Amino acid sequence: MATKSCELVLCFFVFFVISFSAISVSAQTCDNTTGTFIPNSPYDKNRRLILSTLASNVTAQEGYFIGSIGIAPDQVFATGMCAPGSERDVCSLCIRSTSESLLQSCLDQADAFFWSGEETLCLVRYANRPFSGLLVMDPLGAIFNTGELNTNQTVFDIEWNNLTSSMIAGITSSSSGGNNSSKYYSDDIALVPDFKNISALMQCTPDVSSEDCNTCLRQNVVDYDNCCRGHQGGVMSRPNCFFRWEVYPFSGAIDQINLPKSPPPSVTSPSPIANITKNDSRISGGKIAAIVVVTVVTIILVVLGFVISNRRKQKQEMDLPTESVQFDLKTIESATSNFSERNKLGKGGFGEVYKGMLMNGTEIAVKRLSKTSGQGEVEFKNEVVVVAKLQHINLVRLLGFSLQGEEKLLVYEFVSNKSLDYFLFDPTKRNQLDWTMRRNIIGGITRGILYLHQDSRLKIIHRDLKASNILLDADMNPKIADFGMARIFGVDQTVANTGRVVGTFGYMSPEYVTHGQFSMKSDVYSFGVLILEIISGKKNSSFYQMDGLVNNLVTYVWKLWENKSLHELLDPFINQDFTSEEVIRYIHIGLLCVQENPADRPTMSTIHQMLTNSSITLPVPLPPGFFFRNGPGSNPGQSNSKSFACSVDEATITDVNPR
């Protein structure tokens, strides 16, 4: 009896080893037809950056991630995917090793992909052009097992054709919803009489349509049949689809396949693998490795621990977009010297900003959300959602984010010259801003807002335009920053209302403060205030004496308009390289932007035309909103002409301080 028990245990162990023995197939496909890049160029740095963060993004996004980084022509698009059901750590390891293999194999190709499988199947792809939703059939990666079938080919073909056809039909007719790795995935097994089991796996990237997935997989099967019929297995891979079959179970599929009742196959070593080159692509391939056999108890414990950990993590995670890049917290801590004081750039309403440097030499600015700010989580999520979809030279570029434990971090490009208010309102630094520079700054801000309102994929209202949210690069070009308050509008939407007024006093439009109503014209009002501040070098929140009365900047400029003395507004630090007509025209446009009625304010498109075409006749402005006038004995914080009652969230009202 004891002998039989031992035999049963031994048989189970042998079957367990056979079932989990696997072959690892790898083929880096570097496309030589879509261009090359210079090593260590901006494109190469962006490529390395997005691939270095791909593993954390894939594991955070249900096993599938697609996104981009940089601005054309150095923009890099990338995607990563693991087979459904892959353990988080296994998936992460596969993506990391696959990315590293691509970096080592494709030294200067601007487009490459790699389906790799050891403990699981995973895909990594990058390109210099958008590819989401596009079916790409070239190049083809092909590998076949050199071992011969040595069976009745006719009988085998019937089973093989039935298996592949049913798998394709099943994938494309009953795909799961959403963009995740299980959308187009199938693995199955078939028994060939008097032969071994056929194990097969098929997968498409979830961004393509079911029709495109069908086309891609069918072509993979046809290509295998044309090149490799009669062999004991093989792989056909394209950028959007993958097909593999073997005469033994293999990684990426073994956990999902239900083995039919049949005699266990004989234990034989897999035959060598051959590589095929097609469509001017370079394929390196073929490595064989055995998966370490672990006990059933260990597997149960690992799976149980993973499920518990994953459930806890899901409760903490926020629904963030797949366009953005997720950084590991340790990477950010290392880049900022663990958020040291000497790296601190400034402090805002919801946290602090630090300068950092990544391992590849890229300088970054890290916005660290305050752990005590309950409202800040909403703004954090909002900023990632909004900025991830934007690409413009006059908008600060979001490189990614980190969301681990209590830490919520936004990673931006580093803009070297701080913010506009750092220069504009400093009595010694503002003399660096001559008229040409101020005019260029106004023009850049105009183009940035116009992109948000009209030219981007989304219609976005910033809601917090102010001098401290305009960053200046090394050439003093403006970049609009801080999208925590921004809102996305529908295509036909023009106005929205909120019960929670956020922003900065002095820049907020009257209808927003009094009624919570905001629109593109709210941003226009803020932009008008910015124009007046840039030309005068004065803060709108300060108070100015005129005719024995106390005025804010907008009211002060309006009185200058009425007295036909707008030239008095000009900052005395501006040099003589300007014409009074041009400066007065800019002030005139600023007054048009701050008119009380939103309908009277021009759109950003019209403003851009007014600024760039001096032949356009400007309409006469009407009195501004928040027309502010106090007697010398009055409290400057109270208006004699109008009073406003509103509920304003104090945590969202920010001071105008350098960042």
From Swiss-Prot:
Main location, first listed in the record: membrane
Sites of Phosphotyrosine modification: 412, 512
Residues that hold ATP according to the record: 345-353, 367
Keywords, ordered alphabetically: ATP-binding, Glycoprotein, Kinase, Membrane, Nucleotide-binding, Phosphoprotein, Receptor, Repeat, Serine/threonine-protein kinase, Signal, Transferase, Transmembrane, Transmembrane helix
EC number(s) given by UniProt: 2.7.11.-
TM spans (from-to): 288-308
Catalytic activities: L-seryl-[protein] + ATP = O-phospho-L-seryl-[protein] + ADP + H(+); L-threonyl-[protein] + ATP = O-phospho-L-threonyl-[protein] + ADP + H(+)
Membrane topology of this protein: Single-pass membrane protein
Stored SMART domains: S_TKc (SM00220)
Alphabetized Gene3D superfamilies for the sequence: Gnk2 domain, C-X8-C-X2-C motif, Phosphorylase Kinase, domain 1, Transferase(Phosphotransferase) domain 1
Localization in the cell: Membrane
Cytoplasmic side: 309-659
Signal peptide: 1-27
Topological region Extracellular: 28-287
InterPro entries membership: GNK2, GNK2_sf, Kinase-like_dom_sf, Prot_kinase_dom, Protein_kinase_ATP_BS, Ser-Thr/Tyr_kinase_cat_dom, Ser/Thr_kinase_AS
Residues modified as Phosphothreonine: 504
Residues at the active site: 464 (proton acceptor)
Entry's Gene Ontology molecular function annotations: ATP binding; protein serine kinase activity; protein serine/threonine kinase activity
Gnk2-homologous domain mapped to chain residues: 28-131, 137-250
GO cellular component, one term: membrane
Post-translational modification Phosphoserine, affected residues: 468
Annotated glycosylation sites: 32, 57, 152, 162, 179-180, 197, 275, 279
PANTHER family from the UniProt entry: CYSTEINE-RICH RECEPTOR-LIKE PROTEIN KINASE 18, RECEPTOR-LIKE SERINE/THREONINE-PROTEIN KINASE SD1-8
Family: Belongs to the protein kinase superfamily. Ser/Thr protein kinase family. CRK subfamily.
Protein name: Cysteine-rich receptor-like protein kinase 18
Gene expressing this chain: CRK18
